[in-house]
Amino acid sequence: MSQDPHNGKGTFEVHKQPQPGLKVFRKGKYIDPKTFQMSPALIRARRPFFVRNMLALAGLTGFVAGIYGYTMYSLRTDDFGDVPIPPLDPEEIKKLQSKYSDDSKA
């Protein structure tokens, strides 16, 4: 049975327990604190997973490169000739020409 935290006075009692200090940078058990290199135990523990991780990395890299390559291959033949371009007023063309000619001089 759980206790109701309401104390009958319209307020709640808050029981604060002392919190240990927040340690942002904890000492690693398997890393040398002076050189920040992995210990031999950590290297031995990671060794069985190395080949599997590298194969997964190669697979994901190949998959992403394949998608990118297929996208570039598919889009290289698209000329966007069917997209209508709205006509511009001669005043707007002069404005744009003066704007971009000023930018190129600067």
Curated annotation (Swiss-Prot):
Spell out which residues lie on the membrane's Mitochondrial matrix side.
Answer: 1-48
Q: Which residues cross the membrane?
A: 49-71
* Topological domains, Mitochondrial intermembrane: 72-106
Q: List the disulfide bonds.
A: none
InterPro entries, alphabetically?
A: Coa3, Coa3_cc
Subcellular localization is given as: Mitochondrion inner membrane
Q: What family is reported?
A: Belongs to the COA3 family.
Name recorded for this polypeptide:
Cytochrome c oxidase assembly factor 3, mitochondrial
- Source species of the chain: Yarrowia lipolytica (strain CLIB 122 / E 150) (Yeast)
Question: Gene of origin?
Answer: COA3
